[in-house]
Structure formats: C-alpha cells, structure tokens
Regions:
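Amphipathic, hydrophobic N-terminal targeting peptides for secretion and organelle import
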Residues: 1-8
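Short beta-strand edge/turn micro-motifs at domain boundaries
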Residues: 2, 140-181
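Core segments of small alpha/beta cavity-forming domains
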Residues: 10-104
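Proline-rich intrinsically disordered, low-complexity coils
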Residues: 27, 37, 59, 75, ...
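Ordered hydrophobic segments in well-structured contexts
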Residues: 50-56, 117-119, 136-138, 149-151, ...
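Generic detector of ordered, mature protein regions
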Residues: 61-64, 68, 103, 113-114, ...
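Surface-exposed, charged secondary-structure patches
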Residues: 83-143
Length: 182
C-alpha cells in the first residue's frame, strides 16, 4: 500500500467513529416519517439516514418525498433550485440513493437486503464548524470509491438536527443490469 493510500484510508475511517441506523421501515409519507423514532431528528445520524430513505422514495413518489425533504430541511426548506436539481439527478439514475443502504452493490442492482441499514461516519474535519451548529457526516456508497458528504445543522432551541446540504447524488457505477459492458 502506497503512503497516500494509507493516508486516504485513515481519513476515510474517521476520527470520531461511525453510527449505524437500522430503519424499521422506509417512510412513504411525512406522517409516517414523523412517527418513526428517528423522525424526531434529535440525533444527526438519524437525519442523515432518513435523508437517504427519502431520496430512495423520490423516484416512486416525488411529491411525498419533497414533503419529507422539506421537513428534514427544517426552517431552511427546499428552494426551486433544490427541486430542479433533484429532478435532474433522478432522470435516469434512480438507483443512486439505494447505493447508501448496506448491502446494495452494482452486482445486485442496488437492491439492499432488509432491514435497511445506513452507516454514517465522521472524519477529523467533521466537527470543524460544530461551534456554529454544523456537522458533516460521511456515507459510503456501494457504487463509489470514496464516501459522500451530508452536512447537518443543529437548531439549538429544539435540539433537532436538520439537513443543510447533501452530496449524495453524484454519479456512481451503474448496476449490472444497466451496464452494457458487464
């Protein structure tokens, strides 16, 4: 292993540890999401895992997913740009968000086993803006070589963690079923 490979591996492992969230169900409505234990948004890993779950729903039920994303973003809400960005990213790659669920790989067409599990982790820089209320978590994709970021913001008055920005919809390896070279 080369020196830089070792450094990259150390950075990817994280300084503060990792958190695994087992989702008992994939929410299909805002009411269902809010009723889930994770729906209180009191832990940053819960908000991150629910973001993945909601993005998985988007190709099937766009309006319900947008309502849930509005909730996950809290006071910030979704802008017109955010909605257009989501629509553009999901044109032909609805499998991307499923790649963040444990066990989803190109070989199984990003069909993860149940129960659905999301693991997030911190790196040495995750808490650089914690004094301002921001925390950056990382999530591995079964179809990418490097983890993706999700940035959360804490609302001190309620203790809730809201989605601030996500970089989860970048391109990944296509599923075997869609890969002409497989």
């Amino acid at each position: 292993m080369a020196l830089f490979d070792h450094l990259k591996q150390q950075m990817a492992q994280g300084a503060e540890g990792s958190y695994t969230v087992n989702l008992s169900q994939m929410p299909v409505s805002l009411q269902q999401l809010q009723a889930m234990p994770e729906g209180a948004l009191l832990r940053p890993e819960h908000t991150a895992a629910l973001t993945v779950a909601v993005l998985c729903l988007y190709p099937l039920h766009k309006e319900a997913a947008l309502q849930m994303l509005e909730y996950l973003q809290g006071p910030k809400g979704l802008s017109t740009y955010d909605k257009q960005f989501l629509q553009d990213r999901f044109r032909d790659k609805d499998y991307v968000p499923r790649s963040y669920l444990a066990g989803a790989t190109p070989q199984n067409n990003y069909e993860p086993p149940e129960p659905y599990t999301v693991t997030v982790f911190e790196n040495p820089y995750s808490r650089d803006q914690l004094a301002e209320g921001y925390l950056t978590l990382h999530i591995r994709s079964g179809g990418a070589d490097s983890p993706r970021q999700i940035k959360l913001r804490k609302r001190p008055s309620t203790g809730q963690w809201f989605l601030w920005e996500q970089f989860l919809l970048s391109d990944i390896r296509p599923p075997v079923a869609a890969d002409p070279w497989a």
